Amino acid sequence: MPTSVLELKSVDRHYVQGQNTLTILKAADFTLAPGEMVALVAPSGTGKSTLLHIAGLLEHPDGGDVIVNGQPCAGLADDRRTEIRRKEIGFVYQFHHLLPEFTAIENVMMPQLIAGLSPAEARERAGQLLAYMKLGSRTEHRPSELSGGEQQRVAIARAVANAPLVLLADEPTGNLDPVTAGYVFEALEAIVRHSGLAALIATHNEELAARMDRRVTLSDGRVVELPAK
């Protein structure tokens, strides 16, 4: 396995607004090692979501490269980028984006079925993940029947269902009250550590950020290491 599972090399991203060009990322470099949890702590509007979208191959940079598990992705066709993303990267967002017509276990099965697992295999793994997330008694409930914290734990289980190498999370506890946020982060941390994933987690919560292996921020379009707390 490469020494890094995710690397951004001199990544640029800008947006044109009328006659103005807004620079979001400028020669941004970042490396995520296997098994580490990194907090991305920065104010709103500084480019956290853009960085995560580029790192997760959801958005193309204007310059530089993203390397996933040793594979440079600059210049790859979109179908190849999608293949890498589905195999290597899981996503968790502030809002769960669960499919409302499906049960918890069906939501966790979905990415596995897309990846080619049989329904029986997908159901077994989904059940194991939900049990690990302490949702074993809630597998047949639809999202509307679950609390906000339960919904987010289902979303975390779904994100790791295909055993990715990298988990990218954009304010995963941002829509929750402090107590529930703590429970959800504990579940997220437990499954990341248990699975040996590498995780980059954007958060405003300094207390949660301090529990990760290191913290970075965005400054003038670049990724900057923050001192340990």
Curated annotation (Swiss-Prot):
ATP binds at residues 42-49. Transmembrane segments: none annotated. It is a peripheral membrane protein. Keywords: ATP-binding, Cell inner membrane, Cell membrane, Membrane, Nucleotide-binding, Translocase, Transport. GO terms for cellular component: plasma membrane. Part of the ABC transporter complex LolCDE involved in the translocation of mature outer membrane-directed lipoproteins, from the inner membrane to the periplasmic chaperone, LolA. Responsible for the formation of the LolA-lipoprotein complex in an ATP-dependent manner. This is Lipoprotein-releasing system ATP-binding protein LolD. It comes from Chelativorans sp. (strain BNC1).
